[in-house]
């Protein structure tokens, strides 16, 4: 029997929101909290707006995390990332906010966010940020040194 998960997005009609909204994120209980899988999530169609010119910025967002007690529900993550569509923010700020929102939701052992943004004006911006609980600080430092 499947436990009651109380998820709002999965299996429901999907209203797409294009203004940043962290309340769209949902989590479910980690079915194997005794394991340490490194989970990779990739959003190939991330879009936000330049806060100065209001021109669209396009990128690929990579999220990697080691869950503790909760895991992110993928449809809610998709809707959350889509909510950046009309949000004016620099690439680095988007990446930092995504990390902070996911850390608040999941309280993971480790989490990193990497953005590979399309170049504009000949410059490609590729911000990386990561977080770890005390027991994973060494892993965090190694990942930071080896970031793409």
Swiss-Prot record:
It comes from Helicobacter pylori (strain G27). It catalyses: 7-aminomethyl-7-carbaguanine + 2 NADP(+) = 7-cyano-7-deazaguanine + 2 NADPH + 3 H(+). The active site is at 50 (thioimide intermediate), 57 (proton donor). GO terms for molecular function: preQ1 synthase activity. This is NADPH-dependent 7-cyano-7-deazaguanine reductase. One of its GO terms (biological process) is tRNA modification. Its main location: cytoplasm. Pathway: tRNA modification; tRNA-queuosine biosynthesis.
């Amino acid at each position: 029997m499947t436990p009651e998960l109380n998820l709002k997005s999965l299996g429901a009609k999907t209203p797409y929101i294009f203004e940043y909204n962290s309340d769209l994120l949902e989590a479910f209980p980690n079915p194997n909290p005794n394991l340490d899988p490194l989970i990779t999530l990739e959003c190939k169609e991330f879009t936000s707006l330049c806060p100065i010119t209001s021109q669209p910025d396009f990128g690929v967002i990579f999220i990697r995390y080691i869950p503790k007690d909760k895991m992110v529900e993928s449809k809610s993550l998709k809707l959350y990332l889509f909510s950046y569509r009309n949000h004016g923010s620099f690439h680095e700020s988007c990446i930092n906010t995504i990390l902070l929102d996911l850390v608040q939701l999941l309280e993971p052992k480790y989490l990193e966010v990497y953005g590979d943004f399309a170049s504009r004006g000949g410059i490609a911006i590729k911000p990386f940020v990561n977080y770890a609980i005390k027991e994973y600080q060494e892993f965090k430092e190694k990942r930071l040194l080896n970031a793409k």
